[in-house]
Amino acid sequence: MEMMVQKQRHEEGEEERGGLCAREIKELDFFSAAGAGAGRRDDDDVLRADGISSSHAGFMVSTALDLLTAVNDGDHHEEKKGQSNIHQSKQMDAAATTVEGELRQAGEENRRLRRRLEELTSSYGALYHQLVQAQQLHTKHQQQAPIAGVQLLDALAAASPASHRRRAAAAVDGDRTADSDGGEGDENVSPSLGSKRPAAAATLTRLTPESGSGGENNGGGEQAPAAEMAPCRKARVSVRARSEAPMISDGCQWRKYGQKMAKGNPCPRAYYRCTMASQCPVRKQVQRCAEDKSILITTYEGTHSHPLPPAAAAMAKTTSAAAAMLLSGPAVSRDALFAAHHHVVAPPPFFHHPYAGSTMATLSASAPFPTITLDLTQPPPTTTTTAAAAMLQLHRPYAFSSLPFSMYGAGGGSHRPPVVLPPPSSVVETMTAAITRDPNFTTAVAAALSSIMAGGGAQARTPPRGGSDAAGDINGGGGADHATAGARAAAAATQPCGTSPT
């Protein structure tokens, strides 16, 4: 349709230029598609048939499709280049596949090595833990080895067969018979002084609570069960003295390094360190008594590592001896530690202390460490009976303070019921009550004291602080014979009420 419009316009232009050639005017139906198509075909046919002029030939459009291309050298080169590119890409793909396989193998090897490393690390940790436990156990055994040895010796002593005790009793009976025979020949010799030191030791062995109360029940070779032991590796010595000064003068130089309020006591507790040597480990605590403000309580801990001046030797020896009493020898039984107060035997250096005649040594279970208390506030003994009771208390405290005297045996084949004493305030009161109840015991003690006074009067010295002669003998004036006499007096205490000590 557009072609026809252009053609018509072209014809009109030519007519305007001069109308040189007349054209046939044809009617065209623009509203009929079929007519338009037919007219277009007719026009094309007419143009082809009539041979349109050269001006019209310029408008011919070639609609042929040249699908066949000629092959030349350039195209062949491009084809070879494409094939080489394809070959190179295939080679690169193969190389990439090979590298990928190698990486996969390396990853597997890495995972295997990692698992092996984890296993080795776990094994090393387990072995190291076992090594640490073994070292701790070895150290613990080394620390407990000395205590275990002491406990073993004490257990063997506590669990000694009944036959040993019977042999000791037989030795004591034989010694008593010999004493009786010797007394008939020489009336001036006291029966109490005729015994030997081994007999006194056997008598004291017989006075133990285990042999006195359970010896008959453990007959037939049975062993008494050993008391449960509680090792004492560290001890403190507490000294109670009346003083208005901030602290008692013990001859050492101290430096205060702390102070705090103690529970249940309004008075503060001061802490001191010995400054007489740079490495001295001795410490002490000073505090007023809550019940009596005039009493000053000084607690010592440790042993001096330097020479002491003469003024400090007395107190240092006293505290060292009291601490050594807990740390040396058999371990303290746990039953004794749980008791409120138990009187203990002081070692020989403690006997020579000026306050030994009036000192009451007690063990305390309320302190975190085993503590022995030396009470210097007690008045010294003033009578012969009290001195003898104190001597017997020092020789065997447990036998006389925990068991009645009638429980150690029965005389004449008859068994007397045990006499239950009321709880006394001290061992001295216990001894006084026992003396008033047993006339034979009173006779034996009187004989022993008279022998001591007659035999050691020349060597007796006046005890400090108003002590008696008997107390002075105990503190070091009487010698070995006086100690043996005290042991014989203790042996006489174990005799039944119906028999004679000789």
UniProtKB/Swiss-Prot annotation:
GO terms under cellular component: nucleus
Residues of the DNA-binding region: 243-309
PROSITE patterns with a match to the protein in the record: WRKY
Family: Belongs to the WRKY group II family.
Top-rank taxon, per record: Eukaryota
Additional free-text comment from the UniProt record: The gain-of-function mutant plants oswrky5-D (T-DNA activation tagging) promote leaf senescence under natural and dark-induced senescence conditions. Overexpression of WRKY5 reduces grain yield under normal and drought stress conditions.
Subunit structure: Forms homodimers.
Chain residue ranges for the region called Disordered: 75-95, 166-231, 456-502
Tissue specificity field: Highly expressed in leaf blades and leaf sheaths. Expressed in roots, culms and panicles.
MF term (GO), any: protein homodimerization activity
Function (record text): Transcription factor that acts as a positive regulator of leaf senescence. Is involved in both the onset and progression of leaf senescence. Upregulates the expression of genes controlling chlorophyll degradation and leaf senescence. Acts as a positive regulator of the senescence-associated NAC genes NAC4 and NAC58. Acts as a positive regulator of abscisic acid (ABA) biosynthesis during leaf senescence. Acts as a negative regulator of drought tolerance by inhibiting ABA-induced stomatal closure during drought stress.
Biased composition (Gly residues): 212-222
Protein name (record): Transcription factor WRKY5
Record Pfam families: WRKY (PF03106)
Coiled coil stretches, renumbered: 96-123
Compartmental location: Nucleus
Primary localization: nucleus
Keywords from the UniProt entry: Abscisic acid signaling pathway, Coiled coil, DNA-binding, Nucleus, Transcription, Transcription regulation
Effect of loss of the gene: The leaves of the oswrky5 mutant plants retain leaf greenness during dark-induced senescence. The mutant plants exhibit tolerance to mannitol-induced osmotic stress. Enhanced tolerance to drought stress.
Induction: Induced in leaves during natural senescence and dark-induced senescence. Down-regulated by abscisic acid (ABA) and jasmonate (MeJA). Down-regulated by salt, mannitol-induced osmotic stress and drought stress.
Phylogenetic placement of the source organism: Eukaryota, Viridiplantae, Streptophyta, Embryophyta, Tracheophyta
GO biological process entries: abscisic acid-activated signaling pathway; abscisic acid-activated signaling pathway involved in stomatal movement; positive regulation of leaf senescence; regulation of DNA-templated transcription
Biased composition (Low complexity): 197-211, 481-493
Native organism: Oryza sativa subsp. japonica
